[in-house]
């Protein structure tokens, strides 16, 4: 009876440790590459692109509001 519980606990610990190892092995390299690219300045924000995106969003929102106002209310 005790061997069943020991085996179950062992398998659960094995699965949990495998998931933690996989998580950490993917997290650490991505964090290091993010820090390196931040120090090198590769991730500069393009404000003009963000402004254009916001203008397009506002324009589409206004067009949608206009379209919905023309639809009959049921």
UniProtKB/Swiss-Prot annotation:
Propeptide residues according to the Swiss-Prot or TrEMBL record: 46-74
Function: Antibacterial peptide. This peptide gene is up-regulated at the transcriptional level after the venom gland is challenged by Gram-positive bacteria.
Highest taxon above the source species: Eukaryota
Any one GO biological process: defense response to bacterium
Family as reported in the entry's similarity comment: Belongs to the non-disulfide-bridged peptide (NDBP) superfamily. Short antimicrobial peptide (group 4) family.
Organism: Olivierus martensii
Subcellular location: Secreted; Target cell membrane
The name this protein goes by in its record: Peptide BmKb2
GO CC field: extracellular region; membrane; other organism cell membrane
Chief location bin: secreted
UniProt keyword annotations, A-Z: Amidation, Antibiotic, Antimicrobial, Cleavage on pair of basic residues, Membrane, Secreted, Signal, Target cell membrane, Target membrane, Transmembrane
Signal peptide interval: 1-22
Positions where Lysine amide occurs in the chain: 40
Segments crossing the lipid bilayer: none
């Amino acid at each position: 009876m005790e061997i069943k519980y020991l085996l179950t606990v062992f398998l659960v610990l094995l699965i949990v440790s495998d998931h933690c190892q996989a998580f950490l092995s993917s997290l650490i390299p991505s964090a290091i590459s993010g820090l390196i690219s931040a120090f090198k300045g590769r991730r500069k924000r393009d404000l003009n692109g963000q402004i254009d995106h916001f203008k397009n969003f506002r324009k589409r929102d206004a067009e949608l509001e206009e379209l919905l106002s023309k639809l009959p209310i049921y």
